[in-house]
């Protein structure tokens, strides 16, 4: 009785020792024993770098894993933070200065605004106030007049040069030439301007044409008209009833009938170089 009990006790002890030895070696074994599947404490223990201190079944933050390599020797071993700056190579970093530099402030485009004419109310009606008239000195007027006699129209460089010489603006020179041309046209139209002050070849109004002679100076430029008095006057047609009543009486028929009578007529004067066809003969002389 005692011998069988001792054998059973020894077998139970060997089973317990074998089970304990299996649990102790399961940590180093690559395979898990069947009894460890239901053991929840196994998963809570630190087993890998990715799940250190993390319970099983929780979401893993992608920025908390450890990396074991360096990028171009610039980053050390450690955990990534969500807002950390990535380490790019030197070829990419040289373009970072263009992104970080602020854009230069552009100057606003200056637009010249013409001053508006002052408007005053006169008798309840708006009326623009005229600008004061430009007062030219005697030297400026003499220089402008001399230049106007040379050419009534100025090109842009010539106008700028003349304005700089006289101390005027280009607008003042342009307005003076416009007023002077209108005054000259009015005087020239009324005949108060002599012929030598007419527009010359340099003026675009002249169109490079010679000046026309005056109306009172036609004796030197007149040409003799051809003397038409030397031609004999044409003979009038006869309105005899025999010529009007007979429609078949033509010029050729009358010429054949009045051959002897036409020979008795005096010949044409010899002063004529070009023989012109004479009028038809008088049919009234033929009976």
UniProtKB/Swiss-Prot annotation:
Q: Give the protein family.
A: Belongs to the distal-less homeobox family.
UniProt keyword list: Activator, Amelogenesis imperfecta, Cytoplasm, Developmental protein, DNA-binding, Homeobox, Nucleus, Transcription, Transcription regulation
Q: Which disease is it linked to?
A: Trichodentoosseous syndrome: An autosomal dominant disease characterized by curly kinky hair at birth, enamel hypoplasia, taurodontism, thickening of cortical bones and variable expression of craniofacial morphology. Amelogenesis imperfecta 4: An autosomal dominant defect of enamel formation associated with enlarged pulp chambers. Enamel is thin, teeth are small and widely spaced.
Q: Does the keyword Transcription regulation apply?
A: yes
Q: Which SUPFAM superfamilies match?
A: Homeodomain-like
Q: Which SMART domains match?
A: HOX
**Domain of life of the native organism:** Eukaryota
Q: Which GO terms describe its molecular function?
A: chromatin binding; DNA binding; DNA-binding transcription activator activity, RNA polymerase II-specific; DNA-binding transcription factor activity; DNA-binding transcription factor activity, RNA polymerase II-specific; RNA polymerase II cis-regulatory region sequence-specific DNA binding; sequence-specific double-stranded DNA binding; transcription cis-regulatory region binding
> InterPro entries annotated for this entry?
Distal-less_Homeobox_TF, Distal-less_N, HD, HD_metazoa, Homeobox_CS, Homeodomain-like_sf, HTH_motif
Compartment annotation: Nucleus; Cytoplasm
Bias (Polar residues) = 28-38, 198-209, 247-265
Return the annotated DNA-binding positions: 129-188
> Pro residues compositional bias: what residue ranges?
277-287
The entry's cellular-component GO terms read: chromatin; cytoplasm; nucleus
PANTHER family (alphabetical): HOMEOBOX PROTEIN, HOMEOBOX PROTEIN DLX-3
- The protein's name in its UniProt record: Homeobox protein DLX-3
Listed under subunit, the entry gives: Heterodimer with MEIS1. Interacts with IPO7; the interaction facilitates nuclear translocation of DLX3 in dental papilla cells.
- Specify where the region named Interaction with DNA lies, as residue ranges: 131-181
Renumbered to this chain, region (Disordered) spans 20-39, 195-287
Gene Ontology biological process: blood vessel development; BMP signaling pathway; embryonic skeletal system development; epithelial cell differentiation; gene expression; hair cell differentiation; hair follicle cell proliferation; hair follicle morphogenesis
What does the function comment of this entry state? Transcriptional activator. Activates transcription of GNRHR, via binding to the downstream activin regulatory element (DARE) in the gene promoter.
């Amino acid at each position: 009785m005692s011998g069988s009990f001792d054998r059973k006790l020894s077998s139970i002890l060997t089973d317990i020792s074998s089970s304990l030895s299996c649990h102790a070696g399961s940590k180093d074994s690559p395979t898990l024993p069947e009894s460890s599947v239901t053991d929840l404490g196994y998963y809570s223990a630190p087993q890998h770098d990715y799940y250190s201190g993390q319970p099983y079944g929780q979401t893993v933050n992608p920025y908390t894993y450890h990396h074991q390599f360096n990028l171009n020797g610039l980053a050390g071993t450690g955990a990534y933070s969500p807002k950390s700056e990535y380490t790019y190579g030197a070829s990419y970093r040289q373009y970072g200065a263009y992104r970080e530099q602020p854009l230069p402030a552009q100057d606003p485009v200056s637009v010249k605004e013409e001053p508006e004419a002052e408007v005053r109310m006169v008798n309840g009606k708006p009326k623009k106030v005229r600008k004061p008239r430009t007062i030219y000195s005697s030297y400026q007027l003499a220089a402008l007049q001399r230049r106007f006699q040379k050419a009534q129209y100025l090109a842009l460089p010539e106008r700028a040069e003349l304005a700089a010489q006289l101390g005027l603006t280009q607008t003042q020179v342009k307005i003076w030439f416009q007023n002077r041309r209108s005054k000259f046209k009015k005087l020239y139209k009324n005949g108060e301007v002599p012929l030598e002050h007419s527009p010359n070849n340099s003026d675009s109004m002249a169109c490079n044409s010679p000046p026309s002679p005056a109306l009172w100076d036609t004796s030197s430029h007149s040409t003799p008209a051809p003397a038409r008095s030397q031609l004999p006057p044409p003979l009038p047609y006869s309105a005899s009833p025999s010529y009007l009543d007979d429609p078949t009486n033509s010029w050729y028929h009358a010429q054949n009938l009045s051959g002897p009578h036409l020979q008795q007529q005096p010949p044409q004067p010899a002063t004529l170089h070009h023989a012109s066809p004479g009028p038809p003969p008088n049919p009234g002389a033929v009976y």
